[in-house]
Amino acid sequence: MSEHRVNHEPVFLLASSPWRESSLRVEAFSRRYGRVALLARSARKRQSELRGVLVPFVPVSASWYGSQELKTLHRAEWIGGWPQPQGRALFSGLYVNELMLKLTVREDPLPELYDALAEVMEAVCCKAAYIDDLRRFEWRLLNLLGVAPDLHADGTGGDILADKTYRLMPEEAVMPVCEDADALSHEAGAIVEGQSLIDLREGSFRTAESLQQALKITRLFIRHLLPEGLKSRQVLEQIRQFDRKETARETVPTSDGTASNAV
């Protein structure tokens, strides 16, 4: 079987792990070939040209060859982009990479998904407020994977209307809700306003409530696809719990009985 060669393909590194003594096994997402497994020989050696190039969150130009599932990476170049994310943005970048790693299959070309990945990575690395970008990416990912419901019409054939309430369930059409939404809040699925569905569909969140309901929707579908959960989200939640405990410890009562931050 002849070797298939790919040259100068833009990719994002999703994950890497040591391979034997000095090499790396890399999972990358490419624009034309989807997710690919690459063997970067000697990449862990101090003198390797690949050592400082194979980093996540930024686009890289990669060249590889091979007819097996694990290809051989023979060249990689940084093609410019943006700085590495810092603080909590780092966990957001790891979260996006984990979604890509767990929800995509190897060598399934999805150019639109590559473009969506590039957009959200730039936002996470460069913007102070990027949460709306995360919600847009999650919904585009679910759409491109074919698991998101149609947000133009409900299960009865009617248009999604801003002033109506709807129920969303994985693997089902969006259905209008006639009962009191508060009374249904304990039921399975997500109960959301029509305006929030329109905002999610258009990728433009008009209010904080709309953005919060978008999180409810995307989390519902992601949990359905990944019931075992996501490591990056679990770590971030642990950090948030620690921050809340530290804030509580730093808050002390004043002489008049009110609370005051001690720091």
Swiss-Prot record:
Gene3D superfamilies assigned: Nucleic acid-binding proteins, Recombination protein O, C-terminal domain
Purpose: Involved in DNA repair and RecF pathway recombination.
Tree of life domain: Bacteria
Record Pfam families: RecO_C, RecO_N
InterPro entries: ARFGAP/RecO, DNA_rep/recomb_RecO_N, NA-bd_OB-fold, RecO, RecO_C
Gene Ontology terms: biological process: DNA recombination; double-strand break repair
Bias (Polar residues) ranges: 252-263
The keyword DNA damage appears for this protein: yes
UniProt region (Disordered), positions on chain: 243-263
Protein name as catalogued: DNA repair protein RecO
Keyword set, alphabetical order: DNA damage, DNA recombination, DNA repair
Keyword Cell division applies: no
